[in-house]
């Protein structure tokens, strides 16, 4: 199998690329930085410039599956300009990919797999969200993810086997949630966000990478939640980190009002609760390497003693 990856230099994209090479797949990847183009027998980089509508059509040669992971970081300072960029950085690349496929006349592309986020679901402390949930976007993130998914699904006109993965909280030794919690823990403090009762639907970096490859290989259609089977409340998550990291820290409750004062509209990313089901991906046949957060954290802290 030969895969084309967008966003290959990001946290998830890099993990997908490495996992694909371990499985002996051939990989092409797109980058807007010419200095990051490297070529080998099994892995080749190609240049694209979304803003100037340019893509190297050679990137499509022999490709069976496209994995789309490109997009600007969401948790940044929100302005009218940055909000526009967060959305356009997810919409424009898909448009360019579709144009490129048409120009290339490549007929071997059988599957398109695109990232999405569980942030599309409403804040709720009781529901267990499935992919069948009616989507009624209210806030900026929900609206952005909704438009992202709509654009991804438009690829079905060219590639009928189009899938979307709604990704949860990614646990990695390199970046993301664990790195963000690391700084206060160095000073003996763990931060409970608001009530701490909000559900956190997480996934180990190895599992999210392997789910993308699993979907690429099995070639289904539709939307799948990419989360581990056992989510947990944020305050319990902190306690699990304390045990698995072998680090002593005091848990401090940071009230919602303070978070809203410092982060403004972005605070709901930290405070909202989404308990998300992995039943559909399990029924498809994916076997999680890390079903319990204890297993995931033990693995990550073992892999990098400097994580916290």
Question: Language-model segments: what does each one mean?
Answer:
Residues 217-265, 298, 304-308:
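Mid/C-terminal beta-alpha module of Rossmann-like enzyme folds, strongest
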Residues 95-137:
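Conserved Rossmann-fold NAD(P)-dependent oxidoreductase catalytic core, especially the SDR/UDP-sugar
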Residues 44-93:
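NAD(P)H-binding glycine-rich loop region in Rossmannoid oxidoreductase-like domains
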Residues 66, 208, 212, 226, ...:
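Non-catalytic, hydrophobic alpha-helical segments
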Residues 182-190, 197-232:
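Alpha-helical substrate-binding/gating segment
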Residues 268-308:
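C-terminal amphipathic/interface module of NAD(P)-dependent oxidoreductases
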Residues 139, 146, 153-156, 161-164, ...:
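NAD(P)-dependent short-chain dehydrogenase/reductase
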Residues 3-23:
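N-terminal Rossmann NAD(P)H-binding glycine-rich loop of SDR-like oxidoreductase domains
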């Amino acid at each position: 199998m030969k895969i084309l990856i967008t966003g290959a230099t990001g946290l998830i994209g890099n993990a997908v690329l490495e996992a694909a090479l371990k499985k002996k797949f051939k990989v092409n990847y797109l980058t807007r930085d010419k200095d990051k183009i490297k070529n080998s027998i099994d892995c080749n980089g190609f240049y694209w410039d979304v803003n100037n509508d340019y893509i190297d059509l050679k990137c499509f040669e022999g490709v069976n599956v496209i994995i789309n992971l490109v997009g600007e970081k969401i948790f940044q300072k929100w302005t009218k300009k940055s909000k526009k960029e967060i959305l356009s950085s997810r919409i424009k690349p898909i448009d360019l990919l579709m144009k490129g496929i048409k120009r290339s006349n490549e007929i071997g592309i059988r599957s398109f797999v695109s990232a999405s986020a569980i942030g599309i679901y409403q804040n709720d402390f009781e529901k267990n969200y499935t992919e069948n949930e009616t989507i009624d976007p209210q806030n900026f993130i929900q609206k952005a993810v909704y438009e992202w998914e709509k654009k991804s699904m438009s690829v079905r006109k060219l590639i009928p086997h189009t899938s979307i993965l709604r990704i949860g909280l990614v646990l990695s030794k390199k970046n993301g949630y664990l790195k963000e919690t690391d700084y206060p823990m160095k000073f003996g403090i763990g931060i409970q966000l608001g009530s701490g009762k909000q559900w956190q639907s997480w996934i180990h970096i190895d599992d999210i990478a392997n789910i993308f490859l699993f979907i690429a290989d099995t070639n289904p259609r539709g939307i799948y939640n990419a989360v581990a089977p056992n989510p947990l409340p944020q305050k319990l998550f902190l306690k699990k980190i304390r045990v698995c990291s072998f680090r002593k820290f005091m848990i401090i409750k940071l009230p919602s009002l303070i978070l809203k004062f410092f982060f403004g509209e972005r605070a709901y990313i930290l405070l909202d609760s989404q308990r998300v089901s992995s039943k559909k991906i399990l029924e498809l046949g994916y076997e999680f390497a890390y079903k319990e957060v204890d297993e995931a954290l033990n693995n990550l802290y073992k892999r990098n003693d400097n994580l916290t």
